[in-house]
Structures are given as C-alpha cells and as structure tokens.
Amino acid sequence: MSVIIPAHNEESYLGACLSALLCSAPVLFRDGQPVPVQVVVAANGCTDRTCAVARGFGSRMTRRGWKLVILDIAQGSKIGALNAADARASGDVRIYLDADVNVGPDLLRQTWEALQGPLPRYASGRMDIIEPACFASRAYREIYRRVPFQTRTIPGAGYFAVNAAGRARWEIFPDVIADDLFVRLQFDKNERIQLSDSFRWELTEGFRALVRVRRRQDTGTRDLLARFPRLVANEDKPRFEPGELRRLALRFPVGMAVYCAVALMSRLPARSEAWARGRS
C-alpha cells in the first residue's frame, strides 16, 4: 500500500499529517502479517522546511516497518508531484492524501480491506470539517457540511484511494485543477465505497479566501468536464430536495447568507488568481 502526499510549503501541516498516519491501526493480511506500507512525500517547489519535517519522521516510519520516500521536486506543481510520486509508488492500493489532512485511526485499515479484489474500486472516508477560527468561515461551514454533495455522495477531497484495477482507469494525471474530481469521475457511483472512519479537513479562513477557493473550484470543474466530457456520465452530484434549502435557511440564517454570498461573489470576474489554502 502506498500513501502519496503532494506537499508545497507544508512545514506547518505535514508533521500533524504524518503523525496521524503513524497512529493508524495495524494494516494486516488475512494471515496476520503486516501489509507493507510506503509513504511518498512529494515536496514540490518548497521554499520552507517541508523536506526537513518529512525527514524527521524517518526513524518513526522505520520502527513501524514502513518505508518513507521523500521527493524534492524543484517545480511547484501538484500534478507534477502526483505523477512523480506515482512513478515511485510500489503499492497496488494507492492512497492520495493532502498534506494538511489528518486521517482517523482506522482509515488506512478500512481502505486496505475495501479495495481488495479484482474489480476497479474507489474509496474515501467521511469528511470531518474542522471548525474554523473566523466568523465567516464558521458560518459557511454550517451549510457546506450539510449540502447534498457532502451528505449523499463520496466527495473524496483531501483523501481518496484506488486499487490496482482502479488506477488502471487513467494513465498520468492531466494538468487540471480538480485532480480529486478527475479521479472520482473515473468511477460510477456503484464503484465508489464510503468508509466509516473519517479524516480531518480544513476549510479556508476568511470571506475573500472562501470566494477565491470557490471560484477556483468551479473553474476547475468546468475545465475538467470540458476537456473530458466522457466523465460527465459518472457525475452524480445531487441537488437539494424540495424544502431542504428552506429548512437549512431557517435553521442557519447567517450561515445561509454567507454561503449564498460566497456563491454569488465567486461568479464575478476575479481581480487576481491568487491561490488560497483550503477548499469550499
């Protein structure tokens, strides 16, 4: 099993990510022997201590019986990092993990067990959205965690995994913004598996940042489906049921106001395309 972690200037987050991985329950074959685990940190375009943080986990990985591979890639590109890490990955089960995400203790074991077998499969855990610090992001979270895409599908943002037959669905990662959506839509809804354990996922902080991230997300989705129209057949993003939106607005009026304002502002022309951490 290979865990692939693209990381761009993630010194503040990577330590917690790797620590959470190392706290995972044992992943075992049916005979009780440990499954070989390889962790590939693909540092790309880093000007901070990301690589040093990763190297600091070498002895702990060794004690666990895991293999740590650190790639120091000059160019800052998540897609380039994913492809470079894939080229070094040795596991049939591939987990793609963002460096600012913390896995639950049973998520690796559940992932391994769910992805056994010859048929193409995709799996992800439940998304536990960390409560933000700022008012706007907290209000936005109240609605975002309850939208149908979160409650009735398997989003996979931040953590997704495929088995060998599933990974054969595509060759290299194309140069797209929505890499997680690109992979999810390689599978129809009957090929995706929702795991019971969760991963902690961070929402971006601040109204302007929410707008930037939402705009980037929407642009990435449009571009992806325009370039790969065959993937539209596997899109199962549900809409609100009748009355559901109204009930949410009555229960969380401030949250709904912020959520709608972000959606509206994200449709306006962007002044710049500055990158913002987090997703919405």
What kind of region is each of these model predictions?
Residues 203-204, 212-280:
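Terminal low-complexity segments of carbohydrate-biosynthetic enzymes
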Residues 20, 40-53, 75:
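A conserved acidic beta->alpha catalytic loop
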Residues 105-135:
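Conserved donor NDP-sugar-binding/catalytic core segment of glycosyltransferases
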Residues 13-15, 48-57:
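Acidic helix N-cap motif at the loop->helix transition within catalytic regions
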Residues 71-89:
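Glycine-rich, basic loop-to-helix element that forms the pyrophosphate-binding segment
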Residues 94:
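Short aromatic/hydrophobic "clamp" motif used to bind/position activated sugar donors
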Residues 1-2, 38, 182:
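Cell-envelope/extracellular polymer assembly enzymes that use nucleotide-activated donors
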Residues 19-36:
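Short, acidic, metal-binding catalytic loop of nucleotide-sugar glycosyltransferases
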